[in-house]
């Protein structure tokens, strides 16, 4: 519809340019009729009608004009970024044209693995929500969430006062979830110090001795084996053992496991980005070995990115008020989630546990879990991907704040996966998807996409299994099977608004399914414990067979 109106508008404009005389002749009678006096006066009604008509035409033209201007501006900025990237490192970087020419001559293209400067390009930019919250209409939605939090607090206080006869300000759920926090602290310090020292020491030792070694391949395999032992043995099994041996509560487990995954990904990126530089230096017989400094590696360990670079765009100053505001919002989101569980989830599952497991109970549970599930989704996104990452970016003067894009406008799941979490997506894209294509040939794009999905799904399921103390692969099934299917079926060719509605509907339903199934399983294991559980008892769903006893 818009396209037809746009074409008709262009046709009218082109006709007016082709026949200026006819157009002028047509305008003259109208002008004369407008200026013709009626009893010595201009027809005011006709003048007002003409003005209203011109205003309506201008309003019709306005969206087309703004859309054209926005399109041209986006093209201009994109071309500017591409030119800037091609001129990086004083013009020494490979251009897109040269890479494409090389690919024609070498189908496997293993020698054309892009050097670090040709991967992700970091530029100074603000987070999207920081820009949107400057608009009054968007900020009102933010205020609505704050008002909802106030109502949750009032509801909890009033109900507790009626039940207990006094104001109850105990946060028992929070204190339980974050229990045994000293264990979390010393475990994190061990993970950090080992990640800071071992990968850097191994890489430095390998890089300095590679060109001098008489057996460079054996030397590389030996150091690579030591690095894998560190990644799998120390960072892999160490934190997991602490979490299980000390029986930490869920939130404390999440902190350790997420930090474990973050350190593994950062160590991999550091080695992956710097090894090609050393190999190229040895091939060119350079006198200097490109080894990053300790300060550069330390900055990367805290920077809100999983892609290593020697330097990043930096802001000139730190806005400490902005940092304090971001951390305050993170703590506000924690309390928000607490009240959601307290007012929406706990009453729901208290009633569910009084009924035997059935299809009716399951369906009601899923649909009743949609609202709290969606609220938790929004709060998790806002607290971590916006507030937490922006707080550390501001403290480190890290310039590139594009931690997410406008995922809420997605009309396809492929676009949603790319824009929901840009930080993790970049790592998966360059080190799972692109490296798979580089190693196995660029003809297996579907297999490379499947590999990236598999890595993400397995890591998510591992985190949930360890943190909840049971294996219940609901997320894996939704992500690996339904997510993969939607990624191919509902692809980027779907642009109509109805697909955005479908995306939101399935996202809401999926979050309801996750919250319902995992909460049911959690309550079932609390109320139907086994005396001597075997390994199969940890992977067999307890909620399917548990009958609650009171």
UniProtKB/Swiss-Prot annotation:
What ranges does the record list as Basic and acidic residues composition bias? 15-34
**Where are the Lumenal topological domains?**
161-180, 245-252, 353-369, 469-474, 529-550
Q: Which residues carry this modification: Phosphoserine?
A: 8
Indicate whether Manganese appears among the record's keywords.
no
The kind of enzyme this is, by top-level EC class, is transferase
Give the residue ranges of motif FYXDWWN motif: 403-409
Cell compartment(s), UniProt? Endoplasmic reticulum membrane
According to its UniProt record, which residues of this chain constitute the active site? 460
Member of which family? Answer: Belongs to the membrane-bound acyltransferase family. Sterol o-acyltransferase subfamily.
Comment text on domains: Each protomer consists of 9 transmembrane segments, which enclose a cytosolic tunnel and a transmembrane tunnel that converge at the predicted catalytic site: acyl-CoA enters the active site through the cytosolic tunnel, whereas cholesterol enters from the side through the transmembrane tunnel.
What this protein is called in its record is Sterol O-acyltransferase 1
UniProt organism field: Macaca fascicularis
Q: What is the lineage of its organism?
A: Eukaryota, Metazoa, Chordata, Craniata, Vertebrata
User: Gene encoding this polypeptide?
Assistant: SOAT1
